[in-house]
Swiss-Prot record:
It comes from the Eukaryota. Disulfide bonds: none annotated. Belongs to the frog skin active peptide (FSAP) family. Dermaseptin subfamily. GO terms for cellular component: extracellular region. GO terms for biological process: defense response to bacterium. It is found in: Secreted. This is Dermaseptin-J5. It comes from Phasmahyla jandaia.
Length: 29
């Protein structure tokens, strides 16, 4: 349903944010 889609989108956003944060840290070193 709609709620599961929202939850999946949230998980994807968290994953993307985590990857971006890791990338920023790696690039700043």
């Amino acid at each position: 349903g709609l709620w599961s889609k929202i939850k999946e989108a949230g998980k994807a956003a968290v994953k993307a944010a985590g990857k971006a944060a890791l990338g920023a840290v790696a690039n700043s070193v």
